Amino acid sequence: YVPQSDALFPLLTVKETLLFSAHIRLPSSAFKLSEKLERVESLMAELGLAHVGNRRVGNVHVDMDTRGGLSGGERRRVSIGVELIHDPPVLLLDEPTSGLDSSAALKIVGMLHSMAKNRSRTIVLSIHQPSYRIMEHMNSILLLARGHVVHHGTLEQLQWKLVQAGHQIEPQVNILEYAIEDIMSSK
Protein backbone atom coordinates (compact mmCIF):
# COMPACT_ATOMS: atom_id res chain seq x y z
CA TYR A 1 0.00 0.00 0.00
CA VAL A 2 1.36 3.41 -1.00
CA PRO A 3 -0.34 6.22 0.97
CA GLN A 4 -1.14 9.61 -0.51
CA SER A 5 1.49 11.34 1.63
CA ASP A 6 5.05 10.17 1.20
CA ALA A 7 6.53 8.87 4.46
CA LEU A 8 10.26 8.80 3.78
CA PHE A 9 13.40 9.43 5.83
CA PRO A 10 14.75 12.77 4.54
CA LEU A 11 18.40 12.12 5.46
CA LEU A 12 18.64 8.80 3.61
CA THR A 13 19.54 8.62 -0.05
CA VAL A 14 17.20 6.98 -2.54
CA LYS A 15 19.39 3.87 -2.58
CA GLU A 16 19.59 3.74 1.23
CA THR A 17 15.81 4.12 1.48
CA LEU A 18 15.15 1.21 -0.86
CA LEU A 19 17.85 -0.91 0.80
CA PHE A 20 16.34 -0.20 4.23
CA SER A 21 12.99 -1.44 2.91
CA ALA A 22 14.72 -4.51 1.44
CA HIS A 23 16.33 -5.31 4.80
CA ILE A 24 12.93 -5.12 6.51
CA ARG A 25 10.87 -6.95 3.89
CA LEU A 26 13.25 -9.50 2.41
CA PRO A 27 14.36 -12.11 4.94
CA SER A 28 18.13 -12.52 5.30
CA SER A 29 17.61 -16.28 5.31
CA ALA A 30 16.33 -16.11 1.73
CA PHE A 31 18.20 -13.10 0.33
CA LYS A 32 21.92 -12.32 0.53
CA LEU A 33 22.99 -8.68 0.80
CA SER A 34 24.23 -8.83 -2.80
CA GLU A 35 20.77 -9.98 -3.95
CA LYS A 36 19.10 -7.15 -2.04
CA LEU A 37 21.49 -4.62 -3.59
CA GLU A 38 20.83 -6.08 -7.03
CA ARG A 39 17.08 -5.76 -6.48
CA VAL A 40 17.51 -2.14 -5.34
CA GLU A 41 19.60 -1.24 -8.40
CA SER A 42 17.13 -2.94 -10.74
CA LEU A 43 14.16 -1.20 -9.13
CA MET A 44 15.87 2.21 -9.26
CA ALA A 45 16.42 1.69 -13.00
CA GLU A 46 12.82 0.58 -13.54
CA LEU A 47 11.47 3.56 -11.60
CA GLY A 48 13.72 6.05 -13.39
CA LEU A 49 15.62 6.82 -10.18
CA ALA A 50 19.13 5.58 -11.04
CA HIS A 51 20.37 9.12 -11.70
CA VAL A 52 19.29 10.24 -8.19
CA GLY A 53 20.26 7.06 -6.34
CA ASN A 54 22.88 8.83 -4.22
CA ARG A 55 20.80 11.95 -3.58
CA ARG A 56 19.14 12.45 -0.21
CA VAL A 57 15.38 12.19 -0.27
CA GLY A 58 15.11 15.53 1.54
CA ASN A 59 12.12 17.08 3.21
CA VAL A 60 9.52 18.49 0.86
CA HIS A 61 8.58 21.18 3.41
CA VAL A 62 12.18 22.37 3.89
CA ASP A 63 13.75 21.70 0.50
CA MET A 64 11.28 23.61 -1.65
CA ASP A 65 13.85 23.77 -4.39
CA THR A 66 15.14 20.34 -5.39
CA ARG A 67 18.83 21.07 -4.76
CA GLY A 68 18.54 19.61 -1.26
CA GLY A 69 16.16 16.80 -2.09
CA LEU A 70 14.01 15.12 -4.66
CA SER A 71 11.19 16.50 -6.77
CA GLY A 72 7.62 15.51 -5.95
CA GLY A 73 7.55 12.96 -8.76
CA GLU A 74 10.85 11.43 -7.67
CA ARG A 75 9.65 11.22 -4.05
CA ARG A 76 6.48 9.47 -5.19
CA ARG A 77 8.51 6.96 -7.22
CA VAL A 78 10.69 6.26 -4.15
CA SER A 79 7.54 5.63 -2.10
CA ILE A 80 6.33 3.23 -4.78
CA GLY A 81 9.74 1.53 -4.78
CA VAL A 82 9.61 1.03 -1.01
CA GLU A 83 6.43 -1.00 -1.55
CA LEU A 84 7.63 -2.81 -4.67
CA ILE A 85 10.90 -4.06 -3.17
CA HIS A 86 9.31 -7.32 -1.99
CA ASP A 87 7.49 -7.82 -5.32
CA PRO A 88 3.87 -7.93 -4.10
CA PRO A 89 1.26 -9.44 -6.46
CA VAL A 90 -1.10 -6.50 -5.80
CA LEU A 91 -0.16 -2.86 -5.26
CA LEU A 92 -2.66 -0.33 -3.88
CA LEU A 93 -1.95 3.39 -4.27
CA ASP A 94 -3.96 6.20 -2.70
CA GLU A 95 -3.92 9.30 -4.89
CA PRO A 96 -0.51 8.63 -6.50
CA THR A 97 -0.84 11.78 -8.62
CA SER A 98 -1.80 14.12 -5.78
CA GLY A 99 0.41 17.20 -5.56
CA LEU A 100 2.16 16.48 -8.86
CA ASP A 101 2.06 18.58 -12.00
CA SER A 102 0.28 17.01 -14.98
CA SER A 103 3.51 15.84 -16.60
CA ALA A 104 4.82 14.12 -13.44
CA ALA A 105 1.38 12.61 -12.78
CA LEU A 106 1.20 11.18 -16.29
CA LYS A 107 4.73 9.79 -15.95
CA ILE A 108 3.82 8.02 -12.67
CA VAL A 109 0.64 6.48 -14.10
CA GLY A 110 2.41 5.47 -17.31
CA MET A 111 5.16 3.80 -15.29
CA LEU A 112 2.57 1.94 -13.18
CA HIS A 113 0.74 0.82 -16.31
CA SER A 114 3.97 -0.55 -17.77
CA MET A 115 4.73 -2.38 -14.51
CA ALA A 116 1.27 -3.92 -14.43
CA LYS A 117 1.73 -5.14 -17.97
CA ASN A 118 5.38 -6.25 -17.79
CA ARG A 119 5.17 -7.91 -14.37
CA SER A 120 1.60 -9.24 -14.67
CA ARG A 121 0.76 -7.33 -11.52
CA THR A 122 -2.56 -5.94 -10.34
CA ILE A 123 -2.28 -2.24 -9.55
CA VAL A 124 -5.19 -0.38 -8.00
CA LEU A 125 -5.19 3.44 -7.93
CA SER A 126 -7.60 5.79 -6.24
CA ILE A 127 -7.73 9.04 -8.19
CA HIS A 128 -10.40 11.66 -7.56
CA GLN A 129 -10.06 13.68 -10.75
CA PRO A 130 -8.05 11.83 -13.41
CA SER A 131 -7.28 13.62 -16.64
CA TYR A 132 -8.22 12.09 -19.97
CA ARG A 133 -4.54 11.34 -20.68
CA ILE A 134 -4.23 9.45 -17.38
CA MET A 135 -7.40 7.49 -18.15
CA GLU A 136 -5.80 6.19 -21.35
CA HIS A 137 -3.53 4.09 -19.09
CA MET A 138 -6.40 2.44 -17.20
CA ASN A 139 -7.60 -1.02 -18.19
CA SER A 140 -10.66 -0.78 -15.98
CA ILE A 141 -12.31 1.85 -13.80
CA LEU A 142 -14.47 1.58 -10.71
CA LEU A 143 -16.67 4.64 -10.27
CA LEU A 144 -18.20 5.06 -6.82
CA ALA A 145 -20.87 7.46 -5.61
CA ARG A 146 -21.99 7.68 -2.00
CA GLY A 147 -20.46 4.27 -1.26
CA HIS A 148 -22.11 2.46 -4.15
CA VAL A 149 -20.63 1.16 -7.41
CA VAL A 150 -21.94 3.24 -10.30
CA HIS A 151 -19.73 1.65 -12.96
CA HIS A 152 -17.08 -1.03 -13.19
CA GLY A 153 -15.52 -1.60 -16.60
CA THR A 154 -13.92 0.33 -19.42
CA LEU A 155 -14.50 3.93 -20.49
CA GLU A 156 -16.20 2.64 -23.62
CA GLN A 157 -18.65 0.65 -21.48
CA LEU A 158 -19.28 3.75 -19.35
CA GLN A 159 -20.03 5.79 -22.46
CA TRP A 160 -22.41 3.09 -23.71
CA LYS A 161 -24.25 3.10 -20.35
CA LEU A 162 -24.60 6.89 -20.45
CA VAL A 163 -25.92 6.87 -24.02
CA GLN A 164 -28.35 4.06 -23.14
CA ALA A 165 -29.57 6.20 -20.22
CA GLY A 166 -30.44 8.96 -22.72
CA HIS A 167 -27.45 11.27 -22.35
CA GLN A 168 -26.35 13.25 -25.40
CA ILE A 169 -22.55 13.35 -25.19
CA GLU A 170 -20.53 15.59 -27.48
CA PRO A 171 -17.48 13.91 -29.12
CA GLN A 172 -14.93 16.22 -27.45
CA VAL A 173 -16.25 15.54 -23.92
CA ASN A 174 -14.23 13.51 -21.40
CA ILE A 175 -16.62 10.65 -20.62
CA LEU A 176 -15.41 10.16 -17.05
CA GLU A 177 -15.66 13.87 -16.21
CA TYR A 178 -19.14 13.90 -17.71
CA ALA A 179 -20.20 10.91 -15.57
CA ILE A 180 -18.73 12.45 -12.41
CA GLU A 181 -20.46 15.78 -13.07
CA ASP A 182 -23.73 13.96 -13.76
CA ILE A 183 -23.44 12.03 -10.49
CA MET A 184 -22.56 15.17 -8.52
CA SER A 185 -25.46 17.15 -10.02
CA SER A 186 -27.95 14.40 -9.12
CA LYS A 187 -27.19 14.62 -5.37
Regions found by a protein language model. Give the residues of each.
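Q-loop/switch helix immediately C-terminal to the Walker
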Residues: 5, 10-27, 39
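Conserved ABC ATPase "signature" region
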Residues: 19, 35-55
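Hydrophobic anchor residue at the start of the ABC signature
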Residues: 80-81, 108
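Catalytic Walker B motif of ABC-type/P-loop ATPase nucleotide-binding domains
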Residues: 91-95
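Helical segment within the ABC ATPase nucleotide-binding domain
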Residues: 105-120
